[in-house]
Regions:
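Conserved helix-loop functional segments at active or binding sites
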Residues: 48, 52-56, 83, 125
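Long, well-structured alpha-helical subdomains associated
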Residues: 75-127
Length: 127
């Protein structure tokens, strides 16, 4: 990455990307059911970090579309790195919450897939 992302590992049960300080905050490993779940959560937040103006500058998206990009991107990262966190029921339930947005504009799915692929490439270092 052109600009490294700061990662804070701390207590609590919530992972998130804080754009104002450009950092990923993630709970300690023991808060997750396994290593794969921990890594998948980190991948999700790493995709969020690519929206920063010093990376892919994706600040024009709605919250729902940004979450869709992050979830799809995390799936791509895990798949490419052979992280077997394919909890498809969890992914499906999470993605299902964005169905109303997709019904209102089906092109959003394809736009989101393209953005998530770019983000995954950046996180992995293939861009």
């Amino acid at each position: 990455w052109e600009k490294q992302i700061n990662t804070l590992i701390k207590g609590g049960d919530r992972a998130y990307y804080r754009e104002s300080s450009d950092e990923i905050v993630i709970p300690k490993r023991y808060n997750f059911k396994n290593d794969e779940s921990y890594l998948a959560t980190f991948a999700h937040e790493a995709v969020h970090s690519t929206k920063h103006k010093t990376r892919l500058s994706r600040n024009n998206l709605s919250y729902a579309q940004e979450e869709l990009v992050a979830e799809l991107g995390a799936y791509l990262i895990c798949n490419r790195l052979q992280i077997s966190n394919l909890d498809t029921m969890n992914h499906a339930a999470y993605l299902e919450s964005w169905c109303p947005m997709l019904k209102s504009d089906p092109k959003i799915l394809f736009k989101s897939l393209a953005m998530s692929s770019k983000a995954a490439d950046l996180v992995i270092g293939e861009q």
